[in-house]
Amino acid sequence: MTIPNLTTFGFDSEHQAAYDMAYRYASEELYPLCEKMDNDEWFPEEHYRAMSKEGLLGITVPSEYGGSGLNVLFQCFVCEAISYWNHTLAASFLASDNLCLDNLVRNANDLQKHQYCPKFCEGTYIGALGMTEPGAGSDALGSMATTAAQKGDEYILNGRKLFITNGPVADVLLVYAKTDKEKNKHGISAFIVEKNFEGFSVAQKLDKM
């Protein structure tokens, strides 16, 4: 097995160590899953917990919330290593660990971080980002029709999302919705939506190439 030498491109030994670990794990544990995932449209949810034990989840999450406290560059190397052996699971990893979890780390309040981040880091939660909608083109934010209306201390979301990576398996989604239509794409807020929230449902999986 020949593992790419990152130091050739100016990266340091810590980056190389992270890449090596993810590369070896993916080649041994994730590559054998590819055929079943592609042929049977099967998703190995249990492998998220296994990936957590290897330190592959919550890379950018501060240690106080259960993560590794590293930067997004380490996350990129881990994703690339996984993608070399199982590109489907790499896309899932990116949607959960970066688009959803890293977004929470950057923008959620402290209470929300303590509530959600540890479960992502231990592989109990799989995440997704709910942005794209039916009929949306390149202007996914400007054309967004999903709304969020405040009712007392809560917000009521109304709308549909489509082509959401991890959508059928996500435990928690970060959903974008318009809270101020007059501001167009500048009037969008992000909401944490759990799969068991009242009124939330997931449609059928879409066949893919």
What does each model-found stretch correspond to?
Residues 145, 154, 158-203:
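A short core secondary-structure module
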Residues 136-140, 155:
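Hydrophobic, small-residue-rich alpha-helical packing segments that form membrane-like cores
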